[in-house]
Amino acid sequence: MGHKVHPTGIRLGISKDWNSKWYANKGDFAAYLAADLKVREMLRKKLAQAGVSKILIERPAKTARVTIHTARPGVVIGKRGEDIEKLRKEVSELMGVPAHINVTEVRKPELDAQLVAESIAQQLERRIMFRRAMKRSVGNAMRLGALGIKVNVAGRLNGAEIARSEWYREGRVPLHTLRADIDYGFAEASTTYGIIGIKVWIYKGEVFDFSQVGQEKQDDSPRNDRNDRGDRGDRPSRPAREAR
C-alpha cells in the first residue's frame, strides 16, 4: 500500500522553510535540539487556548529569538505584557541564553491547517458529529480563498467497535507538485472511546518566488490567445509574395 510523505518535510528548501534556524558544533547539536523540543512543548502546553499555529526558533549570537504564530495574540501577551514576560523568563531558563519573544497574528485561522485540525479535535471532544465538523471546516476554508482542502479523521468514530478512517476533500490538493503551497496540520482528540487523529491538507496555490512563500499564485484559467488577436480588420495586411 502507498504511504504519503510529510508534505512539509519533502518541500524543505524548495517552497517551505525550517521552524528552527541555527548552527551548532558537533558537541552542541543534541543540547540545542533538546532545548528546542522542551521550549515548544512548554509553550504549547501553556498556550493551549491561544490557538498556536507554529513556533519559530532562531539563535543569533548567543541569544534566542522565538516567534509565536497565534490566532489570539491577546491571550499570549496578557494584560500589560505580564504573561509574555513570564514566558520569556521560562524560555531563557530552558535555553540557557537571553531570549526574545515575538508574537505574530494569524489573520485567517480558517486557512491554517494546524488550527483547522485543532478546531476539529475540540469539536470532537465536545461530542459533535465528525462529519459535520469536517464539512464545516472545509466550507470555511474554501469560502476564504483556499484552492483545495482535504481532511482525514481516523479512530473509533462515533464510538464504533472497529476503528476506521474517513476523509472529505474539496478542490485540488496536488501532493506531488513540489512548488504547490500545501499547509499540513495534525491534531488528536481525546474522547471517551479513545484517541481520534485528524490530518488536514490545505492547498493555497503554487509558489514561484520562493523567497515569498504563498505570496504569488498561478493563474489556473486556460489561456485563449485567439481572443486577444483582435478583429481581422485591425490586423496589418501581409505583404504580397513575389512571383518566382
From Swiss-Prot:
Keyword RNA-binding: yes
Basic and acidic residues bias: start-end ranges: 216-244
Gene Ontology molecular functions: mRNA binding; rRNA binding; structural constituent of ribosome
Any single biological process term in GO: translation
Record flagged with keyword rRNA-binding: yes
Region (Disordered): 213-244
GO annotation, cellular component aspect: cytosolic small ribosomal subunit
Domain KH type-2: 39-107
Keywords: Ribonucleoprotein, Ribosomal protein, RNA-binding, rRNA-binding
Top-level taxon in the UniProt lineage: Bacteria
A UniProt-annotated Pfam family: Ribosomal_S3_C
Subunit structure: Part of the 30S ribosomal subunit. Forms a tight complex with proteins S10 and S14.
Family: Belongs to the universal ribosomal protein uS3 family.
Function: Binds the lower part of the 30S subunit head. Binds mRNA in the 70S ribosome, positioning it for translation.
HAMAP family: Ribosomal_uS3_B
Protein name per its UniProtKB record: Small ribosomal subunit protein uS3
Organism this protein belongs to: Xanthomonas oryzae pv. oryzae (strain KACC10331 / KXO85)
Gene: rpsC
